[in-house]
């Protein structure tokens, strides 16, 4: 690259950094850290353990295309994961 092009790139990079700095100055960084973006979470129900229905499990496993020896349904790997 010639000197003129290098100087142009430097000038443009400096302008970008300055503009970025101006935008950052507008953010309120004095707020409390939080994990969730909104205060409400899981508003539909409480998480709780549910008893399984052995009869349902037995019927489900009978109609499943493939079940391993531990009694879990074996599913095909997604074609997008090749």
From Swiss-Prot:
First-tier enzyme category under EC: ligase
EC numbers: 6.3.5.-
GO annotation (BP), single: translation
Keyword Transmembrane recorded: no
Protein keywords: ATP-binding, Ligase, Nucleotide-binding, Protein biosynthesis
One example GO MF annotation: ATP binding
SUPFAM superfamilies: Glu-tRNAGln amidotransferase C subunit
Matches recorded under InterPro entries: Asp/Glu-ADT_sf_sub_c, GatC, Glu-ADT_subunit_C_archaea
A Pfam family that the UniProt record links to this protein: GatC
Subunit-structure text: Heterotrimer of A, B and C subunits.
Function: Allows the formation of correctly charged Asn-tRNA(Asn) or Gln-tRNA(Gln) through the transamidation of misacylated Asp-tRNA(Asn) or Glu-tRNA(Gln) in organisms which lack either or both of asparaginyl-tRNA or glutaminyl-tRNA synthetases. The reaction takes place in the presence of glutamine and ATP through an activated phospho-Asp-tRNA(Asn) or phospho-Glu-tRNA(Gln).
Name recorded for this polypeptide: Probable glutamyl-tRNA(Gln) amidotransferase subunit C
């Amino acid at each position: 690259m010639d000197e003129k092009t290098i100087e142009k790139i430097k000038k443009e990079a400096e302008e970008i950094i300055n503009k970025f700095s101006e935008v950052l100055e507008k953010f309120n960084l004095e707020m409390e850290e939080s994990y969730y973006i909104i205060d409400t979470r899981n508003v539909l129900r409480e998480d709780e353990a549910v008893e399984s229905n052995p009869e349902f499990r037995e019927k489900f496993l009978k109609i499943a295309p493939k079940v391993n020896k531990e009694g879990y349904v074996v599913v095909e790997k997604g074609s997008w994961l090749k």
